[in-house]
Amino acid sequence: NKQLEIDIQQEINECLDNFESFCFDAGAGAGKTYALQKSIEHILKSEGEILKLSNQKILCITYTNAAKNEILDRLGKNSSVVVSTIHEFLWGFIAIQQELLTEEHKNKIKGELEKIEQKINGNSLSSNVEQNEFRERICDEDFLKVFYSVSSSPAKTFKEVIKGFDEYFSPYLSSVKSFRDFVKDINKKYKLGITLKEIEDKKSKKVIYNPVQNRDKLENYVISHDTLLLYCENIITSQNLLKRLFSDRYPYVLVDEYQDTDEKVVNIIDSIREYSNSKQNFVVGFFGDSLQNIYGSGVGVLPNKEEYKSIEKIFNRRSSSQIVELIEKIRNDNFGQQSIYTDFDNGSYNFYVADDNFDLDIFLQENSLINNTACLLMKNDDISKARGFDELLSALKKFPRFSGGNYENVTNEFLQTNLQQMGWFLRDVLTFIDFIQKSSDPNSTVKEIVQFISSS
């Protein structure tokens, strides 16, 4: 088995030597990161001097900062290797292309304005309001301060405060929800309209990517993680010059945990690969496992996988034969994973059938499993109860962003250790908590407090 593992790494090395793009699939515990490390070391050993002379680099794209740091720890620092999260790298690559970014920003704003116009036209107030006069009233800074101060208040309180500010609004408050939506949409339309005119008049500001908050502020030329990927996809896939600059600078691109990579990123890399195919001087290696897709935004199965050489590693270096056998039953995709060891035979597993009245604590006690037992819970409600944040989750589910058809956002944006995936709402909550902690800490500096205020 160990010789077969060596042969698999040799197969990867040959793809790198021949600039043949590949997809390396390996199950849990197979040593994907180890294979990635060995691949980089192979390139450095065989092509390291040429890379330095040509001012070229190996690009290793990771999904999280934790993965980035792990790879850097294993490799050590090397000037010929760039290990970066995809957002960090893409912004560094595209930030200088302000003319192209501004054009994308203009198109994005136009698209948003179309959506807002549809919402305005669909609002029950649209036929009863003279928009220009209404806009002048609601875009007043004093009104907006009052409006947002009571935006989440009960309907009765909201009506009283708004009427108290200006009796003009009284006829439009029969439906508080319609009024709130109408004010927000008209105000957003007004602000985006100003920014669009600036761009069309060639008076635009620089487009900026904010890695801290996953929320667009298009009127301020600030874009979030998702919008950065959208802009980069549109720009790079349509610009052969940028594809050439990319492939000339980074002839070796290795993508860690490809299954969690956004499809827009895969499209970018795929377009560069197709552009460079005839030159035989660019290779892409995707490392991962389609069934270990954690984040909702990831591709899972690699698109156009048939265009990449498929390399599979079925060996598990981490677990006993019994665990590997159990994993195979759960995967149920005939991957055929097996332990790399012939003498790692330890433990057993059993299946139990339970009904809706199942009680985990009673089950563990009756089966003498109280000690040395780890439990994998599948439902968010069960996880939150076991970890002691069930009240927080219950409160969160009252927000439209995390209820009904949007319930999957609880997993995608809330139950996250990866800050890049965390939604703007919770990111802002964490930022505010951080501010409270800093402001009450006697060791905090004025600079730290000011930084929070300026970024909020």
Q: What is the meaning of each model-derived region?
A:
Residues 1-456:
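The feature marks helicase ATPase cores and/or their adjacent C-terminal helical subdomains
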